[in-house]
């Protein structure tokens, strides 16, 4: 019989840098997970994505065992990396802080495709372009 999921924990952790310190430790401690076991396994799985923030969904079972699924980095993080800026605009409708090309948007959309609710690459690109505009980025051809 399948194990019963007791709790779902969602976190965003820098790749390869999960530590038992806050915020990871307390969130996992409340769920009753072996914190060191999770941090070692997460760091091993995400070592190749250094510098990125990785969303992770941890399923905690009744017997306190767990499994986790890593997602693709948030679109905003990928856009900031592509544009080479630290953060988006505080007033995106007035102040544009960077430009990204449609080729960069397509590359980000292809990376994000498994996690996006999009039927094809064009609709995924439109979602990423919307995120870029809301961050104060200009999308150019």
From Swiss-Prot:
Please report the PTM annotation for this entry: One or more lysine residues are methylated.
Q: Is Ribonucleoprotein included in the keywords of this UniProt record?
A: yes
Gene Ontology annotations for the cellular component aspect, listed alphabetically: cytosolic large ribosomal subunit
| Pfam families from the UniProt entry | Ribosomal_L11, Ribosomal_L11_N
Which SMART domains does the UniProt record give? RL11 (SM00649)
User: Which CDD domains has this protein been placed in?
Assistant: Ribosomal_L11 (cd00349)
Which controlled-vocabulary keywords does the entry list?
Methylation, Ribonucleoprotein, Ribosomal protein, RNA-binding, rRNA-binding
Q: Which domain of life is it from?
A: Bacteria
Q: Which SUPFAM superfamilies does this one have?
A: Ribosomal L11/L12e N-terminal domain, Ribosomal protein L11, C-terminal domain
This entry's Gene Ontology molecular function terms read:
large ribosomal subunit rRNA binding; structural constituent of ribosome
Name the InterPro entries on file: Ribosomal_uL11, Ribosomal_uL11_bac-typ, Ribosomal_uL11_C, Ribosomal_uL11_C_sf, Ribosomal_uL11_CS, Ribosomal_uL11_N, Ribosomal_uL11_N_sf
Query: Where does the secretion signal sit in this chain?
Result: none
Example GO biological process term? Answer: translation
PROSITE patterns given in the database record: RIBOSOMAL_L11
PANTHER family with a match to the protein in the record = 60S RIBOSOMAL PROTEIN L12, LARGE RIBOSOMAL SUBUNIT PROTEIN UL11M
The family note in this entry says: Belongs to the universal ribosomal protein uL11 family.
Subunit relationships? Part of the ribosomal stalk of the 50S ribosomal subunit. Interacts with L10 and the large rRNA to form the base of the stalk. L10 forms an elongated spine to which L12 dimers bind in a sequential fashion forming a multimeric L10(L12)X complex.
User: Tell me, what does this protein do in biology?
Assistant: Forms part of the ribosomal stalk which helps the ribosome interact with GTP-bound translation factors.
Q: Name the chain's protein.
A: Large ribosomal subunit protein uL11
Tell me the organism's taxonomic lineage.
Bacteria, Bacillati, Bacillota, Bacilli, Lactobacillales
């Amino acid at each position: 019989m399948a194990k019963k999921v007791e709790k779902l924990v969602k976190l965003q952790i820098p790749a390869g840098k999960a530590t038992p310190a806050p915020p990871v430790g307390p969130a996992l401690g409340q769920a009753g997970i072996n914190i060191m076991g999770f941090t070692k396994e997460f760091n091993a799985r995400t070592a190749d994505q250094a510098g990125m923030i990785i969303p992770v969904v941890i399923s905690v079972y009744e017997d306190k065992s767990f499994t986790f699924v890593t997602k693709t980095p948030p679109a905003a993080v990928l856009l900031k990396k592509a544009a080479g800026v630290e953060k988006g605009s505080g007033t995106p409708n007035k102040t544009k802080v960077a430009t990204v090309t449609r080729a960069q948007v397509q590359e980000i959309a292809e990376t994000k495709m498994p996690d996006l609710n999009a039927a094809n690459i064009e609709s995924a690109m439109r979602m990423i372009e919307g995120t870029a505009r809301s961050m104060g980025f200009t999308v150019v051809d």
